[in-house]
Every structure is written in C-alpha cells, then in structure tokens.
C-alpha cells in the first residue's frame, strides 16, 4: 500500500517538474497574442549598432505580460519590460525621435526654385536636369506634402523613373546594414539559448535522482519493519513447538 502511494507521488512530482521547465524562450508563456522572433536577455543587452538599427527601423511596440515586443519591418524583437534598453527605446518612439511611425525632422533647409513654364522653343531637358541634383531625402519629404502651386510643375518636370531610382538606391543601401545587425542579434542569442536549454535538463535529472533515493529509503524501511515484527529464529521455534504438540496429541 505504501509503495503504491510512493509511486503516485513520484509521478505527480515528475509531471510538475516537466510543466515548470517546458517554457523556454518563445515557447510556453510567450506563445499567444505576443509571439517573438528574437528574445534579448536581460544579462546581455544589445550593443550600440543593434540599438541604432532598432531606433531606425522601429514601426511599433506592444506591452505584453512581462516583456515588450518591438515590431520591425521583417521580424519582432522582445525584451524585459524593466530593462534599460527597452525603456529607452519606448521613450524614443513615444517622443517621435525614432521609428517609421513618427514624422522625420529634416535638418537641411528646403530650397526650391520656381521654374518658368517651358515654351515650345525651349526643351524640357534643362528643367529636368536641375531637378536631378536635389537630394533624395528632400524629394521623399516633398512627395507626401507638395507646396501649393508646384504640383502641376512637378508632374511635368520630374519623370517617374527618376523617383523610382532614388527609392531603390536607398533600399539597397539599408539592406546590408539590416543583415549585419540581424547577424549580431543571432550571435548574441546563441550562447544564451544553449545555457537556457541545459538548465531545465539538469534540474529535471536532479529531481529524478532525489525521488529515486526517497523511494529506495521507503522500501528499505518497510523491509526492516517486517523483519523486526517476524524474526527468523522466533518463527522457527514456533514451528518446532507446534510439531511437538501435534506429536504428543497423536500419541495420547
């Protein structure tokens, strides 16, 4: 009876140990409404290059149970809600100093020359050449909010293929930097993932050894009690006395 209770207790403890160690990284508690592609540990915060990448490409962030998820164009990055770099990034995004969702502040002044309407004799190549030397940052800033009276002039003077060229050039320049920062994120996350995967296995093995020792102790104690209650010499003497009594009764 005692052995059966001990076995049930062992099974319950093993189930509790497995349930407590099953959540690892993005799994367990972080699977649901806040999935994370990369999780940054509190012991190894991102370096300055990664922080610069996060400030530049941050689109939005979401407060989860015990961490914050930052949404980037390609992936999501999560960190503890009490970490310093997380608080800094949220404050930067809320104040409008970083991120795609906030308006950009352009330091260079806007110099725009009102060009006259082209005549039939003057070709439009001269006006097109003057627009080509404008910086791509100013062109991107002017496209969403054009100045009053200049919309018709831009549509006549700026070809569509030039705007596309500047946009694609900016994307090609930002792509190597994004790949390099993602590679650094993976390198920082590698040793941490190996350590976090080893700790649950060691704790589970320790629990199994402890429970096996408890079970062995209970079995040995039970056998000892049985030997004390029925010693071998006393049982043999009782058997001899019973045989003598039967022999005497048969003789009588």
Curated annotation (Swiss-Prot):
Main location: membrane
Record field: compositional bias (Polar residues): 125-145
Database matches in Pfam families: CXCL16
Signal peptide range in chain numbering: 1-25
GO MF annotations in UniProt: chemokine activity; low-density lipoprotein particle receptor activity; scavenger receptor activity
The keyword Acetylation is annotated on this UniProt entry: no
Chain segments carrying region Disordered: 115-145, 163-195
Record PTM text: Glycosylated.
Keyword ATP-binding: no
Single Gene Ontology BP annotation: T cell chemotaxis
Extracellular side, ranges: 26-198
Residue intervals annotated with topology Cytoplasmic: 220-252
Disulfide bonds: 34-64, 36-78
Sequence ranges of Basic and acidic residues compositional bias: 176-189
Cell location: Membrane
Record keywords, A-Z: Chemotaxis, Cytokine, Disulfide bond, Glycoprotein, Membrane, Signal, Transmembrane, Transmembrane helix
InterPro entries: CXCL16 (IPR026296), CXCL16_dom (IPR048585)
Annotated Gene Ontology cellular component terms: extracellular space; membrane
Topological relation to the membrane, as annotated: Single-pass type I membrane protein
Transmembrane segments: 199-219
Function description: Induces a strong chemotactic response. Induces calcium mobilization. Binds to CXCR6/Bonzo. Also acts as a scavenger receptor on macrophages, which specifically binds to OxLDL (oxidized low density lipoprotein), suggesting that it may be involved in pathophysiology such as atherogenesis.
PANTHER family associated with the record: C-X-C MOTIF CHEMOKINE 16 (PTHR14385:SF0), CXC CHEMOKINE LIGAND (PTHR14385)
Protein family per UniProt: Belongs to the intercrine alpha (chemokine CxC) family.
UniProt name for this protein: C-X-C motif chemokine 16
């Amino acid at each position: 009876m005692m052995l059966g209770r001990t076995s049930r207790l062992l099974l319950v403890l093993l189930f509790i140990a497995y349930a407590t160690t099953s959540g690892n990284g993005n799994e367990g508690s972080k699977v649901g409404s806040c999935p994370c592609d990369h999780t940054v540990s509190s012991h190894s915060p991102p370096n300055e290059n990664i922080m610069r990448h996060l400030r530049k490409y941050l689109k939005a962030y979401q407060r989860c149970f015990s961490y914050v998820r930052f949404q980037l164009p390609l992936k999501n990055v999560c960190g503890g809600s009490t970490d310093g770099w997380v608080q800094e990034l949220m404050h930067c995004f809320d104040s409008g100093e970083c991120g795609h969702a906030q308006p950009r502040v352009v330091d260079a002044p806007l110099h725009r020359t009102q060009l006259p309407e082209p005549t039939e004799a003057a070709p439009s190549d001269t006006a097109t050449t003057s627009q080509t030397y404008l910086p791509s940052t100013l062109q991107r800033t002017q496209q969403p909010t054009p100045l009053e009276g200049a919309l018709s002039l831009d549509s006549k003077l700026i070809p569509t293929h030039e705007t596309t060229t500047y946009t694609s050039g900016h994307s090609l320049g930002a792509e190597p930097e994004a790949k390099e920062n993602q590679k650094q994120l993976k390198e920082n996350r590698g040793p941490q993932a190996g350590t976090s995967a080893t700790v649950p296995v060691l704790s589970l093995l320790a629990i199994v050894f402890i429970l096996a020792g408890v079970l062995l102790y209970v079995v040995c104690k039970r056998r000892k009690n049985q030997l004390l209650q029925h010693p071998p010499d006393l049982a043999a003497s009782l058997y001899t006395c019973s045989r003598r009594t039967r022999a005497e009764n048969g003789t009588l």
